[in-house]
């Protein structure tokens, strides 16, 4: 099987970003975004998805974290789309439930070519440290739009906001791993009755 890797650069007046991914990696990471809690969550995607991630971003953090978080989502989505290619031979669908103490989240993803996000996370507070948790909606929307996936995220229970978010990102990584995994019974075939995705 060909290497499923990609490197994407995206430069705007708000951010300068470079993202490299290896879908068949071991969870190696290197991050330089200037947003530590965000990097902690990106690490969950890589470690639990066994996806190598290298992400650099110079953003307008003097304003706030919004553009950095959203634009990393966009660029990561573009990198996934490029790395996965025509989607032949993949499982396509992935899902995961992940607990952390009192918190439990479920994530379901479909590499359908149809971007859509349903995200239900009733955060118990607005910030973790200085990080605005609403920005994770922007991250996932950016990813969904540019990876061309359908993504359902549900935090089923939890009272600690850090735990709620961490279970979401761990489940997201595991769902991605399942969806992009090569299916030995679908070699060379598109996992759709339409014949294309």
UniProtKB/Swiss-Prot annotation:
Q: What is its main location?
A: cytoplasm
Please provide, in alphabetical order, the Gene Ontology terms of the cellular component aspect for this entry: cytoplasm
List the keywords (alphabetical).
Amino-acid biosynthesis, Cytoplasm, Histidine biosynthesis, Lyase
Mention one GO molecular function: imidazoleglycerol-phosphate dehydratase activity
Enumerate the subcellular locations listed in this protein's record, separating them with semicolons.
Cytoplasm
Q: Recorded E.C. number(s)?
A: 4.2.1.19
Enzyme class, spelled out: lyase
The UniProt entry, under CDD domains, shows:
IGPD (cd07914)
The UniProt similarity line reads: Belongs to the imidazoleglycerol-phosphate dehydratase family.
The protein, known as = Imidazoleglycerol-phosphate dehydratase
Provenance organism = Azotobacter vinelandii (strain DJ / ATCC BAA-1303)
Q: Which gene encodes it?
A: hisB
């Amino acid at each position: 099987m060909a290497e499923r890797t990609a490197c994407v650069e995206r430069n705007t007046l708000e951010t300068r970003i470079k993202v490299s991914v290896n879908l068949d990696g071991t969870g190696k990471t290197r991050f330089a975004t200037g947003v530590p809690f965000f990097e902690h969550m990106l690490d969950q995607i890589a470690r639990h998805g066994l996806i190598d991630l290298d992400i650099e971003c110079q953003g307008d953090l003097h304003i706030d974290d919004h553009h950095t978080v959203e634009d990393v989502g966009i660029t990561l989505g573009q990198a996934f789309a490029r790395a996965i290619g025509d989607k032949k031979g993949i499982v396509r669908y992935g899902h995961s439930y992940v607990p952390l103490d009192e918190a439990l989240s479920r994530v379901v993803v479909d590499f359908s070519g149809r971007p859509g996000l349903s995200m239900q996370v009733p955060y118990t507070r607005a910030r973790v440290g200085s990080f605005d948790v609403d920005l994770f909606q922007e991250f996932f929307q950016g990813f969904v739009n540019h990876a061309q996936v359908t993504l359902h995220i549900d935090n089923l229970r939890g009272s600690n906001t850090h735990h709620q978010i961490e279970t979401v990102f761990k489940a997201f990584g595991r769902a991605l791993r399942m969806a992009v995994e090569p299916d030995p019974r679908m070699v060379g075939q598109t996992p759709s009755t339409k014949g294309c995705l």
